[in-house]
Every structure is written in structure tokens, then in C-alpha cells.
A protein has these predicted regions:
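Structural and coupling elements of P-loop NTPases
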Residues: 1-606
Length: 606
């Protein structure tokens, strides 16, 4: 047993403050000099993570406290990235469950906690943000206990220590009346409550690969926990997959240990530690990296299957190749294959159509993050509307169902219930949540929730909070009506003119502004009615040599509606596509030529 080490994962709902708490822990444990400038949310290393305030990739870090090395793993709180969570928990011997003092346990708290309890981990519960004006700490503790009971926690797991904290201000207390100074009560609780790794140091080396990334100097890097034995640089190892088949044989060219947020080269790694190794070219996540004498793989949690997919194709619009540097199908294919290799929650399939690829994932957010990442890397591509992945059980078609928890002002609850009923959702619970708020729980088909976020925010005037979580597969619920309004489609290619836009404003909401480039078949707005309408946004004012007073007034344009990438993916209909380039996001019809559109519509209805 390695007494001088603890491995702990931090789990929570999205935006409950995991990453901020780790920042404070690192600052207080002496990881930085007193005069060192430190950025916010150190663990969110990607641009998208910092921008959106969400953790997408699980990352380990390490701090020292009273001579004990504590490895901390920051996990994603969003269920779309749950593929990471399941594997990461296998590296830990204990978990810190972080819950917002006002919001209480949320769907993703339930999702991640359920995974942790199933693996037999004993949590330490932290009620975070207790300094908020609407904090209700005592009630939240009761809700957390009820959640543990609902998730079949055993007696040892139910006997969890409770701490109250403010990760942002860097303090933690055992009782709310205690002096609020540092986070040392939390670190002391970790040393007391989390067991040291129970490992065999003398056995042959074996490690379970949990995370995979690539480094421009080291190549393929596998991060995981050493389950038994020791390993030194340049020793021979073999990689075995979950079926026990050998993947490859190689040498450990580099061994790295985590020190704060950086990786430090070491000559030897021991059982119980979380390390990063380089030197293998084919080994992947869930493989066992072991000494040549080891033949049995280490068990790894099976990953939940993807529930949603999009089709990604080469950009074939009139503006193709003008804004991005990576435009060919070969480049897109290689990038998607690389992503599917590193990210096990993403699946890659060649589509039947030429130059198109089917990408499966856990939800709109995960697929949207992949497309946005590729966009920033200089790719041009087109994306279809997300579609759910059905499965057949005993000859019956089944679809993914999600649990939806909605917190909304009581005045808007009827509008939300009505909207979700139209999307084949079934209400399972409804109760008042205090201060004029209502909490409603639904079971809804995933396909009915595509694009619902925008409508939900409109219906609740931006005050509602919606959280979703994969629940189960259930028999197909029947057809769901899509977008009610038709599209405004450009008839020509060129630059949109203010005069034309001004005269078309009463036809619907426009997506383009003055001097914006458009092409034939591009969707430039949403029609007021149910049918599509073709319009000319290039039409300028007729110039004459006769001037009449009052006819040259400046036109006033309504601000065009701007949609985010995920909103656009959800907005489009099956006969439409989203064009993604580094500079622009454009909606378009699948067939740009109006005659071809009519011909295809006739063929489909025949």
C-alpha cells in the first residue's frame, strides 16, 4: 500500500465550480511563487473550455500536502462528455462531490455520482458557493443524501463527510460558523477519508490507459494509473486490448509525472501513481500497457454508446475554398479519424454518399464542440441536422429518451409544458421550488429536444434553466413536427443591399446584414409563413436623373438574428445544411438550384 499518495477525482454538475476550486487548492498548496501571475481556471486549457466555462477533457494535476502527494483529476460535468468521466473514475480511490448551495443536485451530478458509487468510491461532499445570497445549504445537504439513497449507495458511502466552501474565495469549513480562512480542512479530510492506493509494487508492471493525447515532441501520450509493479525508461512493454489480444510491443521512451499543471520527466514510476507514458504508436484508451510477462488485461468500464449523429461533408458552396485552408475530403477524413481515435465517445463511419462522413456522439454540445474546434483549425465543411441513433430490440424500433429537469418562473410553466407535450415528452414530476419557481421533470425523446433550447429561452424570457441527461431507450414515440416557419432563400449570388433588405423585412426575420456576401440557395432569413420563399437581396434602388424631395431617406434596418453554431445545427431541416468556415457560418439548402430542389422534392414525395 502506498501511504504517501492519494488519488481523487472531483465530480459535479456543469458550472458548479470544480475547476475554480482546483485553482484555489493549487495556489494554497504552494504550487506558485507569491509574485507569479496565474490565469483563471488553470485546468481549462483549451480556448473553447475557457470561452464556454465548461471542462471538456478530463485532466490530472498533482499537489503536495503534509508530505503526501495528492493526484487530483478534474472531470467534465456535462453528460455529453460523460465518456471521459467513466474512465477517469477508474484512476481514483475517492471522489469529491461538489454541489452548488443554491441549485442543489442537478442531472449531471446524478449522472457522475451514479458512476462513482457503482465503482465503490466513497465521496466527500462539498456544498460550494455558500456565500451566494440565495444559498440554502441545509436543504441541499438533505437533497444530496436523498440522491445517494436513490442511487443505492451502501452504508459506508452514506456516511459521507460534509464541508462548506467558496472555491472562488478559497476557503472551506466543517461548520458554517467556523472561521473562513483556507482550504486546509478539505485537504485534511482527503488525507483522512480517502484510502491510499492498495497496490502490489513487486508484481510485474501493468497500467490502464485512460486518456490519450498527442504531443508534437513526444508523439502519442497515454495517461493512466499504474495498477501494479514499477517501470523504468526504455523498458519493453506490450499493449493488450480488453479482449486480451496484443495490440503492439514497444519501449517506454518517456515517463512523465504530473506536478501542478505541468508534466515532469522521471526515470521510474510506481504502482498507485497517475502517470503519462510515451513510446507506443497504436495503443489506445482502455488498453492495458504491461510488462511482456502479463497476459490478462485490466477490466475497463464499457463506454455508453453514442445517441446522436451528424453527417459532415466537403463544402461545395460557391464560396468554397475562399476562407479556409483545409478544404479537401482527405484532410477532413484524417482529422475526424484522429478525433475518433483520441475521443472514445465519438464514432466515425464512412457515409454512403461521396466525400461524406457520419460522426456519432453523446449530444448536440459534444458534436458542436468538435465542429467548432475544426473550424478554428482552418477547416471548411458542411454539417447536416443532428439525427438520433435508433436501435432495434425484438423487432421493435427504439429511440433514446432523456430526463429533462426544468427550473422556471411559475408564470411560464404552462408554456413550457405545452411546448414539450408537442415534442412527445411525458411529465413525471412537478413541484414548487420556492420564491415563485417551479421544477418540472420530463422524459422526452432526444430528437424532440433538438433545437428546443432556443424556443425554451424565448418562452421563459431567458429566465428558465434546463438540464438534460440520457435516461434509457424506449419504443419509438411517433412523428414530431419540425420547424413551423419556412426559409427565405436567396435567388442570386452577390452582396446583400440595404435597400433590398429594408423592403423584405416584413416578410420575416433576416439572418444577413448590409454588404454581406450571399449565394443562390443560401438561407438569408426565416419566413413569416410555413412555406419557403425565394427572395432577391441584391436588388438596388433604380437610379434616375430626376430627384424628388423626401425619396432619398436613409433606410433603417432591423438587427439581423444571429445564431450560435449549435443553434444553427438544430435549426436546419433535413433538406438543409450548415456551411462552416473559419470566418462564417451560413445556412443553405442541400440543393442550391431551385429547379433541382423542386425535382428532388417531387422524387421524395413520389
Amino acid at each position: 500500500m502506498s501511504e504517501q499518495m492519494r488519488n481523487i477525482a472531483i465530480i459535479a454538475h456543469v458550472d458548479h465550480g470544480k475547476t475554480t476550486l482546483i485553482d484555489s487548492l493549487m495556489k494554497q498548496s504552494g504550487m506558485f511563487r507569491d509574485n507569479q501571475q496565474v490565469s483563471e481556471r488553470l485546468m481549462d486549457s483549451g480556448d473553447l473550455e475557457k470561452e464556454r466555462g465548461i471542462t471538456i477533457l478530463a485532466k490530472p494535476t498533482s499537489i503536495e500536502w503534509q508530505g503526501v502527494r495528492i493526484n487530483i483529476i478534474d472531470t467534465p460535468g456535462h453528460a455529453d462528455f460523460g465518456g471521459e468521466v467513466e474512465r477517469v473514475l477508474q484512476m481514483a480511490d475517492g471522489v469529491i462531490l461538489l454541489t452548488d448551495a443554491a441549485e442543489g443536485p442537478m442531472p449531471q451530478t446524478k449522472f457522475v455520482l451514479g458512476k462513482a458509487l457503482a465503482q465503490g468510491l466513497c465521496p466527500i461532499v462539498i456544498i460550494n458557493k455558500v456565500d451566494k445570497s440565495d444559498a440554502r445549504s441545509e436543504e441541499v445537504v438533505d437533497e444530496v443524501f436523498d440522491l445517494f439513497v436513490a442511487l443505492d449507495a451502501n452504508e459506508q458511502q452514506l456516511d459521507f463527510p460534509i464541508l462548506y466552501a467558496s472555491g472562488r474565495d478559497g476557503w472551506c469549513v466543517v461548520n458554517l460558523d467556523d472561521e473562513r480562512t483556507t482550504l486546509s480542512p478539505l485537504l485534511d479530510t482527503v488525507l483522512r477519508h480517502v484510502p491510499a492506493p492498495d497496490v502490489e509494487v513487486d508484481a510485474p508492471f501493468a497500467m490502464l490507459a485512460t486518456l490519450l493525447d498527442s504531443d508534437q515532441f513526444l508523439g502519442r501520450c497515454l495517461t493512466g494509473r499504474v495498477m501494479q509493479g514499477t517501470a523504468r525508461v526504455n523498458e519493453a512493454v506490450r499493449a493488450i486490448n480488453l479482449e486480451g489480444k496484443q495490440v503492439e510491443v514497444g519501449r517506454l521512451t518517456k515517463l512523465l509525472r504530473f506536478d501542478g499543471t505541468s508534466r515532469v520527466p522521471v526515470n521510474e514510476v510506481k504502482a498507485g501513481d497517475i502517470v503519462c507514458i510515451a513510446g507506443l504508436t497504436k495503443a489506445s484508451v482502455s488498453d492495458t500497457i504491461a510488462a511482456p510477462s502479463v497476459t490478462t488485461p485490466i477490466f475497463s468500464t464499457p463506454i455508453d454508446p453514442p445517441t446522436m449523429s451528424v453527417t459532415i461533408t466537403v463544402n461545395d458552396s460557391p464560396f468554397a475554398g475562399t476562407e479556409g485552408s483545409k478544404v479537401t475530403s482527405t484532410m477532413i477524413r484524417e482529422r475526424l479519424l484522429a478525433e475518433a481515435e483520441v475521443n472514445v465517445a465519438i464514432t466515425f463511419q464512412e457515409s454512403a454518399a461521396k466525400d461524406s462522413f457520419e460522426i456519432g456522439g453523446r449530444g448536440e454540445l459534444q458534436l458542436g464542440v468538435l465542429v467548432e474546434t475544426m473550424r478554428r483549425e482552418g477547416f471548411e465543411l458542411t454539417v447536416s441536422r443532428p439525427k438520433v441513433l435508433y436501435k432495434t430490440v425484438d423487432g421493435q424500433r427504439q429511440e433514446p429518451i432523456e430526463e429533462v429537469i426544468i427550473d422556471v418562473d411559475s408564470d411560464y410553466s404552462s408554456a413550457v409544458i405545452d411546448a414539450l407535450n408537442k415534442r412527445k415528452a411525458e411529465m413525471s414530476d412537478m413541484r414548487t421550488a420556492g420564491s415563485g419557481k417551479t421544477r418540472i421533470v420530463f422524459l422526452a425523446p432526444s430528437r424532440g429536444l433538438i433545437g428546443f433550447q432556443g424556443k425554451f429561452l424565448t418562452d421563459t424570457r431567458g429566465t428558465g434553466v434546463m438540464n438534460r441527461l440520457f435516461h434509457s431507450y424506449a419504443p419509438f414515440k411517433g412523428a414530431i413536427t419540425g420547424r413551423r416557419n419556412g426559409a427565405l432563400i436567396s435567388t442570386d449570388t452577390g452582396v446583400a443591399v440595404a435597400y433590398a433588405l429594408f423592403n423584405l423585412q416584413d416578410r420575416g426575420a433576416l439572418f444577413v446584414s448590409h454588404q454581406e456576401k450571399v449565394y443562390q440557395g443560401m438561407i438569408v432569413g426565416e419566413h413569416n409563413r410555413e412555406n419557403d420563399l425565394e427572395i432577391n437581396v441584391l436588388k438596388g434602388k433604380k437610379l434616375t436623373n430626376v430627384r424628388a424631395s423626401g425619396t432619398d431617406d436613409a433606410v433603417t434596418l432591423v438587427t439581423p438574428r444571429k445564431l450560435s453554431l449549435e443553434d444553427m445545427m438544430a435549426y436546419i431541416n433535413p433538406d438543409e445544411l450548415l456551411e462552416v468556415t473559419p470566418d462564417s457560418l451560413r445556412l443553405r439548402k442541400k440543393y442550391l438550384d431551385p429547379n433541382e430542389r423542386k425535382r428532388m422534392a417531387r422524387a421524395e414525395s413520389a
